[in-house]
């Protein structure tokens, strides 16, 4: 790409020691004080796989964090292990929320903890139902009916259980059975509980939603329940169900009241938990907004910055296009890492994707093979499309609202002295752990040596194994006098 004159972005030469900053490229260092810059701190980073989004944007952001609260979504545990000691030394409270292996983290998330009103119940149900909509061809009638049924079951659990968790709601759904009466209306094993609630308050929220379901014809009710059950099964894995029983719960107010770093680990290859993670983000934004509204100045005491790696992979965050429009006034900001604008539009739709882009005052383009994205960048930067498509590896274009585009190189994180120290200490810890594992393995007999994958697989099979009676025991269980029911069935 031909060299072009660049205009200064008014990048300050010096900042006070220990001030939060944003490093967005070689020589591109900015304050995060919105009052000074006049801009919001929302950043959209676009680059193909391997373009350096994480190492050149995310890791420098963590390096330059001293007083802001951080919510960092990662698929690579190395980042978590690498930066926890650094942030702890700076006085950060570390929260580790691992959706892949919940027991590995030090905190859990239960959506039931944030129910403060009947409106919250409805929001939770709608978020769960809509989270899987992208993977289905939904009929809004079935989704709305399933949400109404889920409203009833959540409310019933909250009203009748001591210290309820979402695991209790899931157990209620799992145990629910439906049958029909002589008039073809629905009967279930929960009818008595809802009659009891109705006797206490005929207009209570749980019974009102339950009547909507129980007055349906049995076949229609069966379809509604099937819709809900399939969504629940695809959203809440056995690992998540275990997490709901963990004692230490996440409280979003902590992010706003003290300097906190929350690391969220998801899987890059397991899409089954994506809808639940989207629910988590929706709940987090809602809780932080509500908490900010309760403050005298309408803002969070501590600014909260969300770093969302692979933001456009998985399921859309409910209402995110609305949230991002008002993040700044609550002292909340986001860094969204995506591979292309097309990817964002395919997840959120063209209108919502445009809203998200327009509410990011900073845009970092690090190269992509996506033609539509390159065309937009070509128009925005006023340079030929050919130059965009042929951008050298390691180069980038930085857009800041109110300034001309800045053409330069991505930030060389490995040349940062503090990062070199972080990396050095991390490698020492990894090497020490490796030596310990080698010692343990060397003490085992050769026939007991299995790789990690085999051990995990074997442990899982042992955990779920159910001993099945032998064929003889099945045969012996039928007496000579009794008819062979199975044989009769097959004859029919």
Task: Give the predicted meaning of each segment.
Residues 368, 421-422, 430-433:
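Short, intrinsically disordered/low-complexity patches at protein termini
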Residues 52, 64, 271, 363, ...:
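A broad, structure-centric signal for solvent-exposed, well-ordered loop/edge residues
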Residues 167, 245, 297-298, 344, ...:
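Flexible domain-boundary/linker segments
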Residues 86-89, 111, 350-353, 379-382, ...:
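Short secondary-structure boundary/capping segments
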Residues 324-406:
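Conserved ATP-driven motor cores of ASCE-family P-loop NTPases powering translocation/secretion/packaging/pilus
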Residues 3-8, 16, 20-332, 383, ...:
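P-loop NTPase motor domains
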Residues 275-276, 347, 375-378, 408-412, ...:
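Short conserved micro-motifs at the rims of enzyme active sites and ligand-binding pockets
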């Amino acid at each position: 790409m031909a060299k072009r004159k660049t205009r200064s972005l008014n990048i300050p030469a010096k900042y006070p020691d220990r001030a939060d900053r944003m490093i967005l490229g070689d020589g591109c260092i900015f304050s995060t004080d919105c009052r000074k810059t006049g801009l919001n701190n929302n950043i959209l980073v676009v680059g193909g796989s391997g373009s350096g989004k994480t190492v050149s944007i995310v890791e420098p952001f963590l390096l330059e964090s001293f007083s802001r609260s951080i919510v960092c979504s990662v698929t690579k545990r190395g980042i978590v292990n690498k930066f926890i000691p650094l942030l702890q030394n700076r006085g950060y409270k570390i929260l580790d929320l691992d959706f892949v292996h919940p027991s590995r983290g030090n905190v859990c998330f239960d959506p039931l903890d944030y129910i403060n009103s009947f409106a919250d119940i409805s929001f939770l149900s709608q978020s769960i139902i809509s989270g899987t909509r992208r993977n289905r061809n939904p009929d809004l009638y079935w989704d709305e009916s399933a949400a109404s049924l889920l409203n009833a079951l959540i409310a019933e659990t909250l009203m009748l259980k001591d210290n309820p968790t979402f695991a209790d709601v899931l157990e209620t759904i799992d145990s629910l059975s439906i049958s029909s009466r002589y008039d073809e209306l629905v009967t279930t094993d929960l009818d008595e509980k809802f009659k009891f609630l109705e006797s206490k308050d005929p207009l209570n929220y749980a019974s009102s939603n339950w009547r909507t379901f129980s007055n349906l014809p049995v076949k229609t009710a069966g379809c509604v329940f099937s819709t809900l059950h399939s969504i629940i099964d695809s959203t809440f894995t056995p690992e998540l169900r275990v997490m709901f029983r963990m004692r230490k719960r996440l409280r979003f107010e902590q992010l706003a009241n003290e300097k906190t770093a929350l690391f969220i680990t998801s899987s890059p290859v397991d899409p089954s938990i994506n809808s639940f993670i989207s629910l988590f983000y929706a709940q987090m934004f809602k809780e932080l907004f509500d908490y900010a509204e309760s403050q005298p100045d309408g803002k969070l005491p501590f600014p909260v910055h969300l770093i969302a790696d692979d933001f456009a992979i998985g399921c859309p965050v409910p209402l995110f296009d609305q949230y991002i429009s008002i993040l700044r006034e609550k002292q909340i900001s986001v860094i969204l890492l995506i591979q292309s604008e097309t990817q964002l539009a395919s997840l959120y739709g063209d209108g919502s994707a445009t809203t998200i882009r327009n509410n990011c005052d900073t845009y970092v383009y690090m190269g992509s093979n996506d033609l539509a994205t390159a065309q937009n960048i070509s128009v925005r930067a006023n340079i030929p499309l050919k130059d965009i498509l042929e951008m050298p590896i390691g180069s980038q274009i930085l857009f800041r609202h109110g300034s001309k585009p800045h053409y330069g190189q991505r930030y060389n994180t490995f040349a940062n002295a503090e990062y070199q120290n972080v990396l050095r200490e991390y490698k020492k810890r990894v090497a020490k752990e490796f030596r310990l594992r080698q010692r343990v393995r060397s003490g085992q007999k050769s026939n007991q040596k299995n790789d990690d994958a085999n051990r995990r697989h074997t442990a899982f099979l042992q955990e779920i194994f159910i001993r099945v009676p032998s064929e003889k025991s099945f045969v012996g269980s039928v007496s000579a006098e009794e008819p062979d029911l199975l044989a009769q069935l097959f004859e029919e």
